[in-house]
Amino acid sequence: MSLSTSELLELCGFLVSVAKQGGKIITSAHPSSSDFAAKKNSADIVTETDTAVECMVQAELKSRYPTFDFVGEETYKTDQRITEAPTFIVDPIDGTSNFVHGFPAVCISLGFVIGRKPTVGVVFNPFLDELYTAVKGCGAFYQRADSERQKLPLLSSPLRGLGPACIGIEWGSDREGVNFELNLKVFTTLARTRETGGRFVNSLRCTGSSAITICRVAAGQQDLFWECGNWAWDVAAAWCILNEAGGMIVDGHPGEWDPPINNRRYLAVRPAPSGQKEIVEEFWDVIGDDRSTYGPPQ
């Protein structure tokens, strides 16, 4: 099934209105350490607000688009698959731990895919009133509050390798085993001086929200974002925004330039007139032969 550009633009506008409804729920909540439950450990938190936002989003989307599939973080089942059908992929609150701690890097992420390819993306941070949107073939845009909408990227220059790069990277919730060891290797190799076997990159940033970080990559404000262990709802909306801005997402493991939406390993690269391929290969060289256990569902 395909939708016309006008239909996709209409869908995007509807997603923006739904995202702003969700934003009101998020900003009206007052989470504390007494009302959250740990999913896996204290670094992976789910709140009642997640569920409330997702229920609202699902109801609104099903009412308007009853035949489209829906995949949401809070209602996901382990046997659920993303098919070729038109599918909404939703993270009601990306940056839940930030939300609980009052750190305003929090967003609602509403993605739409057709044929498992990012087609529409809406990412809204209600605390900073920042909105990122994209429709396939129509470009990507950023708007803060009532300011004029700006086309992405906001900044663009050649990529000049890892040395001068500002890289988004996260520890994730695995703090032992091979996944943690790979994170540790990548972190330390990027940070170390060249004299001690590292790449001595300009800066590493842990924001706590994959969607927001990928949008910053799309804006040209960060050069790369790497994480293994993410889910499709963490990246689907921002992926469309990055693509439309002229950036790209490749596999978080070396070798695959066109990973599936549910790959669970992602390396995002900002828009640039040159240097994208070279910086990807340089980053993959940091990973080397080590691998995480994450990958698309079998």
Regions found by a protein language model. Name each.
Residues 1-93, 293-298:
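N-terminal subdomain of lithium-sensitive/metallo-dependent phosphomonoesterases centered on the IMPase/IPPase/PAP
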Residues 140-142, 146-149, 174-176, 273-278:
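Short helix-loop capping/hinge motifs at secondary-structure junctions, enriched
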Residues 2-12, 16-17, 23, 185, ...:
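Oxyanion/phosphate-interacting regions
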Residues 120, 166, 223-224:
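Short, Asp-centered acidic motifs that coordinate Mg2+ and/or phosphate
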Residues 157-183, 187-207:
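Short loop->beta-strand "edge-of-pocket" segments that line small-molecule binding or catalytic clefts
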Residues 147-161:
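Conserved beta-loop-beta connector loops within the AMP-binding
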Residues 26, 50, 61, 96, ...:
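Residue-level signal for inorganic ion chemistry
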